[in-house]
């Protein structure tokens, strides 16, 4: 930790309080706990959590932290799954200040909605809601949006998503602060919007919503991953279509993982797909889905909107352990989910201090709550679950609906398996069930924490030309597992593989064995959850981090790199 004296820290904290107000500064460890603890795992100490209320306040807080030689950890929704939004242990060489951007949730629609300007606390849900009346959509819909994830958090971690045509979150237009080689804080405006010259002019103009159409330039820089549709169609490529450390997708704020303080990003929006249709496909032979994927990507004129895979085992786990999530979204809508996740986080933090309550009390309570309701999945889905091991949820739109239906009818005249055309309710519930799967494994581990060691969650991208996508583990690894849960974005070849580990197994050693197998298969990991503190960043990604943050003052240690100032290694 920092050698700064208690007196110096007191003066520093007084300065932060002066900048944002006492009510927007937390120093009590009990009150900062939910900001210091990760969504799934990871935690550490922090000197303070500060909540600036304007971009200009954020700039002044950053300057104060740089002057006082503090580590800066930018945090929005804290929904990351790989510990990248929180401190990691207590072996840092300086004090940590967490800057929460939740109050900075403005959104500016550019033109007729073709582009937007998102601020540090803008959520995917608020963006989706603002665009809906305009017939537009953001990069990502139902998924991260349901738990209150931020738009800029997605950009900084080039997060993925289920929408085949949109690729990972990406932009080349952003406004960010960088600590340069001399330890000086600088503001860089690459938004392509005329905002003035000084930080005060630039940030005040954004804070006061004084952007005019004439200020916005269109100079050819990209505000989404424009090339993704070509990459995902290349079924002979020996590389994945997308993964976090792809050097071609690292650009300033995009992929910076907190190594820059991002004030705003400019993003493209997408025309909402009309006349959508879900086809529910089942088979007992993985090669059938391989053929479907390869044919659609190589030959269909219309790319799918989405193509989601679920194995029977995760279908079952999600049916039982994702039921309350399913019902809440189905009955209350996605707009209530951030509130419930926030409430759960606060309740967990409070109950942790009460000895009377067992760990994971809220998870156990919500699990019991779900049992009170009748079966929630449509009969035809249940029938397909009984008949088939592998499930593909194929969503098409426009002319793609007829194209897919015609081809699937012909294909299943000779292929093992079958499909049915979903009613609107079946299609909605099928995708909602797939969404619930993402949290079901975590719920299982929480409810059965006395019986299982942990959950090992891997997030992988396979080579586009890989035909052996379905994993077969060697017996010495398989014997250490209670459940193997496979689901993912099948057209993109991005899989989430959650392993429930038997009690007493060394999870860290098991993970290393798993990653070695993935390396042998030519897979890249992580695919869309980013390295956080759980994965080692490849050298190209480490180089990108060092370029963005030469003094290693912003989110140090990310990707298992040095936590020390100026990237010094521990002797």
Where are the language model's segments positioned?
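A charged N-terminal "starter" segment
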Residues: 1-28
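Conserved glycine-rich FAD pyrophosphate-binding loop
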Residues: 3-5, 20, 39-41, 47, ...
């Amino acid at each position: 930790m920092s050698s700064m004296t208690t007196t110096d820290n007191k003066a520093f904290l007084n300065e932060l309080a002066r900048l944002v107000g006492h009510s927007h500064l937390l120093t009590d460890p009990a009150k900062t706990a939910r900001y210091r603890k990760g969504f799934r795992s990871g935690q550490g100490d922090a000197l303070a959590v500060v909540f600036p209320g304007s971009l200009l306040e954020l700039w002044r807080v950053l300057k104060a932290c740089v002057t006082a030689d503090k580590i800066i950890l930018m945090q929005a929704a804290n929904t990351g799954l790989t510990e990248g939004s929180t401190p990691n242990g207590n072996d840092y060489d300086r004090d940590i200040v967490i800057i929460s951007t939740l109050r900075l949730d403005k959104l500016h629609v550019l033109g007729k909605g073709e582009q937007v300007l998102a601020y540090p606390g803008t959520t995917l849900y608020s963006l989706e809601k603002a665009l809906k009346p305009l017939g537009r959509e953001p990069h990502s819909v139902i998924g991260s949006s349901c738990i209150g994830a931020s738009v800029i958090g997605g950009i900084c971690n080039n997060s993925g998503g289920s929408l085949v045509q949109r690729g990972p979150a990406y932009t080349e237009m952003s406004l960010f602060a960088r600590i340069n080689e001399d330890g000086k804080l600088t503001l860089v405006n690459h938004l392509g919007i005329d905002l003035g010259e000084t930080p005060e002019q630039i940030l005040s103009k954004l804070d006061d919503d004084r952007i005019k159409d004439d200020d916005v330039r269109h100079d050819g820089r990209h505000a989404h991953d424009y090339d993704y549709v070509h990459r995902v169609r290349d079924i002979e490529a020996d590389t994945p279509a997308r993964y976090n450390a792809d050097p071609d997708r690292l650009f300033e704020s995009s992929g910076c993982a907190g190594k820059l303080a991002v004030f705003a990003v400019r993003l493209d929006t997408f025309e909402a797909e009309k006349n959508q249709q879900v086809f529910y496909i089942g088979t007992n032979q993985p090669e059938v889905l391989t053929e479907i994927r390869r044919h659609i990507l190589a030959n269909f004129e219309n790319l799918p909107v989405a193509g989601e895979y679920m194995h029977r085992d995760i279908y079952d786990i999600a049916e039982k352990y994702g039921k309350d999530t399913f019902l809440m979204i189905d009955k209350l809508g996605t707009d209530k989910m951030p509130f419930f996740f926030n409430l759960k986080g606060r309740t967990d933090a409070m109950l942790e201090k009460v000895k009377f309550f067992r760990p994971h009390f809220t998870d156990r309570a919500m699990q019991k709550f779900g049992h009170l309701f009748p079966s929630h999945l449509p009969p035809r889905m249940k029938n397909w679950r009984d008949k088939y091991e592998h499930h593909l949820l194929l969503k098409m739109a426009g002319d793609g609906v007829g194209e897919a239906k015609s081809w699937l009818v012909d294909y299943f005249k000779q292929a093992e398996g079958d499909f049915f055309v979903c009613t609107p309710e079946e299609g909605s519930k099928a995708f909602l069930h797939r969404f619930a799967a993402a949290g079901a494994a975590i719920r299982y581990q929480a409810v059965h924490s006395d019986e299982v060691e942990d959950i090992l969650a891997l997030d992988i991208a396979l080579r586009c030309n890989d035909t052996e996508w379905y994993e077969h583990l060697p017996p010495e690894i398989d014997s250490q597992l209670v459940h193997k849960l496979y689901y993912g974005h099948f057209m993109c070849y991005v899989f989430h593989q959650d392993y429930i580990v038997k009690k007493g197994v060394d999870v860290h050693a098991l993970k290393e064995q798993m990653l070695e197998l993935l390396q042998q298969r030519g897979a890249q990991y992580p695919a869309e959850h980013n390295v956080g503190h759980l994965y080692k960043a490849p050298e190209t990604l480490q180089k990108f981090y060092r370029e963005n943050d030469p003094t290693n003052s912003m989110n140090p240690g990310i990707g298992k790199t040095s936590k020390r100032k100026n990237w010094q290694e521990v002797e």
